[in-house]
């Protein structure tokens, strides 16, 4: 099935926390924005000049991404913002945790703006600080907290990053998760000893990394459910585990079904299955290649003309890759699936409103992380940046 033929179902009703497969996706594409807004956005950007720097995540819609000064994954964009100290305003076309990370990494004279404050992340919201602190207390009660290092995926709130910083842990991306877990185990004597990891908030990235990259078994991993007493685990299970996975997932990547892979291989000769590690372990086992958004982009760029690919990641990115590489047969790894509904809250009307407000001298939707949280979250990020040898890209 080509991108053009795909029945599009972009707007979810919200995350089903009891399901591994994310959200329901009724509805149609959002209506196209008024073409006049394009000229207004251009005029506002021109009026602001170098005072504004617009960041666009790979999953943003085309009407927004055209105005980005830089596109990339969440951590690349935060670092790009930090590398532009002369820009007074950082307009982040992404979601809330990304804007928080940009605020943490930029200077005090810079202001980070999120065009729509409702652009959150369901995965990041699955790990709340109070829940994580309760889990930490339960680990202490089980007698294992002193052996645990918390590791959080970049896709988490500043509060969770700070929790990891305070408790000897760090942040990771999908590219450096393996080396981050290796570092974490080493802090408590190594994987062969009593060391354990609490991995937040994406269980699938944690499981895929622990099992497929580090050689642990699926049975070495247990899942902590914050909605069940004791996480749904016994003290004995906690003591036996090597990796304690938080019960979180990406609502988009969680929808891809392993069954689709078999159908695609039967209908598209020679198709290569390329997926993001936020997908379920069962799907990843059936894929040919697994990697971050940057890895996916580079893989398609380097692929030979005429090759066939089915990609399991957010649809906006897959559509752009298909348009950019017409010499390759690129399809989407499902018959119907959501766009990231929260990412798509950043639309052209919100971007124009944010930019025109700046032209008028008003800062709207500023994202500010409080100083204490920023200090500890920055420590967790700096530990990641000090890791040897691996990319720090999503």
From Swiss-Prot:
Main subcellular localization, coarse class? cytoplasm
**Which Gene Ontology terms cover its molecular function?**
4 iron, 4 sulfur cluster binding; metal ion binding; quinolinate synthetase A activity
The protein's UniProt keywords, in alphabetical order, are: 4Fe-4S, Cytoplasm, Iron, Iron-sulfur, Metal-binding, Pyridine nucleotide biosynthesis, Transferase
Q: Which cofactor does it need?
A: [4Fe-4S] cluster
Pathway given for this chain reads: Cofactor biosynthesis; NAD(+) biosynthesis; quinolinate from iminoaspartate: step 1/1
Entry's Gene3D superfamilies?
NadA-like
Q: Which SUPFAM superfamilies match?
A: NadA-like
Tell me the Pfam families matching this sequence.
NadA (PF02445)
| GO CC terms | cytosol
* Residues binding [4Fe-4S] cluster, per UniProt: 121, 250, 340
Spell out the subcellular localization from the entry. Answer: Cytoplasm
Q: Got any disulfides in this one, which pairs? A: none
Q: EC no.? A: 2.5.1.72
Q: How is the cofactor bound?
A: Binds 1 [4Fe-4S] cluster per subunit.
InterPro entries attached to this UniProt entry: NadA, NadA_sf, Quinolinate_synth_A_type3
Q: What class of enzyme is it?
A: transferase
Q: Can you tell me which residues bind iminosuccinate? A: 57, 74, 153-155, 174, 276-278, 293
User: Its Gene Ontology biological processes?
Assistant: 'de novo' NAD biosynthetic process from L-aspartate
Catalysed reactions, semicolon-separated: iminosuccinate + dihydroxyacetone phosphate = quinolinate + phosphate + 2 H2O + H(+)
Report the sequence similarity comment from the record: Belongs to the quinolinate synthase family. Type 3 subfamily.
HAMAP family per the record?
NadA_type3 (MF_00569)
Protein's job: Catalyzes the condensation of iminoaspartate with dihydroxyacetone phosphate to form quinolinate.
UniProt xrefs under NCBIfam families: nadA, PRK09375.2-2, PRK09375.2-4
The name under which this protein is listed is Quinolinate synthase
**Gene behind this protein:** nadA
């Amino acid at each position: 099935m080509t991108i053009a033929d795909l029945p599009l179902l972009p707007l979810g009703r919200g995350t089903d926390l009891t399901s591994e497969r994310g959200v329901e996706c009724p509805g149609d594409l959002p209506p196209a924005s008024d073409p006049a807004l394009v000229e207004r956005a251009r005029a506002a950007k021109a009026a602001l000049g170098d005072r504004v720097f617009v960041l666009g995540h790979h999953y943003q819609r085309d009407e927004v991404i055209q105005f980005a000064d830089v596109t990339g994954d969440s951590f690349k964009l935060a670092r790009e913002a930090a590398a532009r100290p002369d820009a007074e305003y950082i307009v982040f076309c992404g979601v809330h945790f990304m804007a928080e990370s940009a605020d943490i990494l930029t200077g005090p004279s810079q202001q980070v703006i999120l065009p729509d404050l409702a652009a959150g992340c369901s995965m990041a919201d699955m790990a709340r600080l109070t829940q994580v602190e309760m889990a930490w207390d339960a680990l202490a009660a089980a007698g294992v907290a002193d052996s645990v290092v918390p590791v959080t995926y970049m896709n988490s709130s500043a509060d969770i990053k700070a929790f990891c910083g305070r408790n000897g842990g760090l942040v990771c991306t999908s590219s450096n998760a393996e080396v981050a877990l290796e570092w974490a185990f080493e802090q408590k004597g190594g994987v062969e000893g009593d060391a354990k990891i609490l991995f937040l908030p994406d269980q699938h990235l944690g499981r895929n990394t622990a099992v497929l990259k580090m050689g642990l078994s699926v049975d070495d991993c247990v899942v902590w459910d914050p909605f069940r007493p004791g996480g749904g685990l016994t003290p004995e299970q906690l003591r036996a585990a090597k990796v304690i996975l938080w019960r979180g997932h990406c609502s988009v990547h969680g929808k891809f079904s392993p069954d689709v892979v078999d159908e695609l291989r039967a209908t598209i000769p020679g198709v290569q299955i390329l997926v993001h590690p936020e997908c379920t372990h069962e799907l990843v086992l059936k894929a040919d290649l697994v990697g971050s958004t940057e890895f996916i982009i580079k893989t398609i760029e380097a692929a030979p003309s005429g090759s066939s690919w089915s990609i399991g990641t957010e649809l906006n990115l897959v559509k752009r890759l298909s348009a950019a590489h017409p010499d390759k047969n690129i399809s989407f790894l499902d018959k119907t699936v959501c766009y990231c509904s929260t990412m798509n809250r950043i639309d052209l009307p919100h971007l124009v409103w944010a930019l025109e407000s700046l032209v008028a001298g008003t800062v709207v939707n500023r994202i500010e992380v409080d100083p204490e949280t920023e200090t500890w979250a920055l420590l967790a990020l700096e530990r990641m940046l000090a890791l040897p040898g691996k990319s720090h890209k999503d």
